[in-house]
């Protein structure tokens, strides 16, 4: 029923009251405009974007599967990143420990080389190779001296046991001759301590006679 029909059936307004009542009747008969409903949210999931031809239930299940796969991938990447960080930290710690051990080892070597240099007479070398060469030569000399002393001990020519010869003077010519005789006796006697005792006794008797 339109506004033209309502105007035909209602009498023409004769006053302001009738005009107002006429307008109220028109407004009461005019259908009230319904408020427009808000548009539905169009939340399209990633599954609906990639699979538009799939039905609603199937789309939801596929979207859940994709979301779960993404979470698993993120967890795997996070775990792998943590493992890489731990390995890197472990390598850094091992490198620092190795450097510290190497530094201590070099310090000990330098200390030992300085101590060895003090034992070698007239050693003025600074590099390690030259210092070791000097140490080898010095040890060879010491070894030769030890062998020489061993041979002298075997022959009874130990300098520690040989009597000291005083300077030749007119007053001690006889004593010098006696000591020479004692030395010849010591060289001719067997290698034992008895000749030394005998020579000492002879020296004592000679001194007594003088």
Curated annotation (Swiss-Prot):
UniProt record, GO biological process: fruit dehiscence
Composition bias type Polar residues, residue spans: 27-48
GO cellular component, one term: nucleus
Keyword DNA-binding: yes
CDD domains: bHLH_AtPIF_like
InterPro entries: bHLH_ALC-like_plant, bHLH_dom, HLH_DNA-bd_sf, PIF1-like_bHLH
Chief place where the protein resides: nucleus
Subcellular location: Nucleus
Keyword DNA-binding: yes
MF-aspect GO terms: DNA binding; DNA-binding transcription factor activity; protein dimerization activity
Record's keyword terms, sorted: DNA-binding, Nucleus, Transcription, Transcription regulation
Expression sites by tissue: Expressed constitutively in roots, leaves, stems, and flowers. Confined to the valve margins of the silique.
UniProt domain bHLH: residue ranges: 93-142
Annotated segments matching region Disordered: 1-49
Subunit (UniProt): Homodimer.
Role summary: Required for the dehiscence of fruit, especially for the separation of the valve cells from the replum. Promotes the differentiation of a strip of labile nonlignified cells sandwiched between layers of lignified cells.
Name the record gives this protein: Transcription factor ALC
Organism: Arabidopsis thaliana
Phylogenetic classification of the source organism: Eukaryota, Viridiplantae, Streptophyta, Embryophyta, Tracheophyta
């Amino acid at each position: 029923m339109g506004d033209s029909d309502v105007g035909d059936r209602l009498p023409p307004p004769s006053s302001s009251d009738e005009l107002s009542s006429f307008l109220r009747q028109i407004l009461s008969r005019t259908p009230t405009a319904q408020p427009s409903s808000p548009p539905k949210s169009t939340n399209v999931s990633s599954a609906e974007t990639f699979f538009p031809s799939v039905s609603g239930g199937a789309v939801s299940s596929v979207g859940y599967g994709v979301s779960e796969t993404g979470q698993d991938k993120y967890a795997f990447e996070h775990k792998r990143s943590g493992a890489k960080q731990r390995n890197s930290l472990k390598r850094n710690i091992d490198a620092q420990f190795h450097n510290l051990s190497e530094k201590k080892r070099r310090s000990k070597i330098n200390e030992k080389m300085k101590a060895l240099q003090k034992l070698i007479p007239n050693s003025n070398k600074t590099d390690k190779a030259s210092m070791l060469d000097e140490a080898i030569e010095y040890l060879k000399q010491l070894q030769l001296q030890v062998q020489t002393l061993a041979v002298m001990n075997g022959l009874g020519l130990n300098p520690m046991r040989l009597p000291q010869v005083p300077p030749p003077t007119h007053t001690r010519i006889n004593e010098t001759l006696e000591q020479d005789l004692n030395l010849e006796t010591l060289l001719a006697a067997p290698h034992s301590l008895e000749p030394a005792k005998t020579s000492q006794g002879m020296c004592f008797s000679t001194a007594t006679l003088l």
